[in-house]
Amino acid sequence: MEKGRPFAHMVEAVNARAWLESTKERGMALGLEHTARAIEALGLPAPTYETVHVAGSNGKGTTVAALGSALHRIGCRHLSFTSPHLVRVEERVRLDGRPVSTAFFDAALADVHAMAARTGLSLTFFEVTLLVALVVAADQRPDVLLLETGLGGRLDATRAVPADLAIITSLSLEHTDILGGTLEAIAAEKAAIARPMKPMFVRDVADQGARRSIQRAADEAGNPEIGEQPAAAQLHWVKIEPEANYFDEARAMAAAAWGSLTCAEKTKFPDFRGLHWPGRMHEVVRAGSGQRWLLEGAHNPSGMETSCRALQHDERWKNPWALLFGSTPQSEMAAMLEPLVNLCRRHPPVAIVLTEPQFGRYPGVPCTELASALGRHDLQISASFAHPQEAVAWVEAQSSTLTDVLCIGSLYLAGNVLQALGADDDEALSIVAKD
């Protein structure tokens, strides 16, 4: 529960929100200088909490969610920073799994806005929301702060925040134009979150080049540009079965790191069978029709492969079901579609509906392109809609014949669909462990 923070004046809140929206025009800016300067300019008190920094190609948000849920189970207060948000920006800053209130977010945002105006710092949307999370953490004083990287690690804004523990989840080829074209290069970027003399837990990887990169980053941990004295990190490899789904991976990574947290070191890692993690294997049952929607974010080829592998034995495919698919641009669209095509061949859907995710960093892939790509696999498209709300309405109109719906692809699409279904209150957007 939030406590103690004064609200921002209404005019301040409106101005700060307008400024936050304008920062989207700056796009993405890799580098630590602006964030480090902003943290210093905010004059926040020295942290009383432990900070956990999580990176990886897939599953990093789920690991944050699993670790946060476990901390909540033993009574440790935690604040998490994750991205992207599905419906509203407050989701990026969760206190004990629940998005902070609009008033609370606005009060912290007003502080960041005032600092930027005073210093003249030009900040991105991601940097601003990270700084909001740090202001909230300074005010709320949780036991643990959980940070999810946005992209990579070495030059991600979250790297400017001091941390006590680092976690790296599964690695795959993604954002190769920025992070490099090999797993070795990508591993080096992500493993740069290693902190001097602090533990770093890494999902074991078979690629020898990637292993060398991670070992080197651990041996040479520390970034003098942000005041760190280089020294070796404490590297721990975590063995996980290659076929593990994201929740199993997240639980294993969280359990491995558990004993390194001061507030958890004398407790056993709590047992829970799953998570309500918005947009990830997220089920919504429609009142009245009983139509079941399953929302799954799978935003790159390896993510789609893992998701479809987890879904292939689901009992719901014995019922008449529909596929709703939309994606942001992919450098390897054919590889992205292959697992989904295989799922459709194994369990043919009654209808395939295409749409274009809205309000994301990148525009959605046009339905015509998706239809052409899927058509090469002899999959027939039932309907296409530029706007997800129209696609949801079409699928709901078929509820008498379509008992189940799989919405998969972009996380932004999951957010669009949650809004269209009216399943976007704080309860729906909170992270909760399932017994």
What are these regions, as identified by a protein language model?
Residues 12, 26, 32, 36-47, ...:
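ATP-dependent carboxylate-amine ligase catalytic core
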Residues 144-147, 157-159, 163-167, 172, ...:
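Nucleotide phosphate-binding/pyrophosphate-handling subdomain across enzymes
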Residues 144-148, 163-267:
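Acidic, Mg2+-coordinating active-site environments of NTP-dependent enzymes
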Residues 67, 154-164, 418-419:
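Short Gly/Thr/Asp-enriched flexible loops that form oxyanion-binding sites at enzyme active sites
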Residues 207-229, 233-234, 248, 259, ...:
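C-terminal helical cap/extension that packs against the catalytic core
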Residues 357-360, 426-435:
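Short, flexible loop segments at boundaries between secondary-structure elements
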Residues 20, 57, 78, 146, ...:
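Residue-level signal for inorganic ion chemistry
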Residues 1-58, 62-77, 86-87, 201-202:
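N-terminal leader/targeting and accessory segments in enzymes
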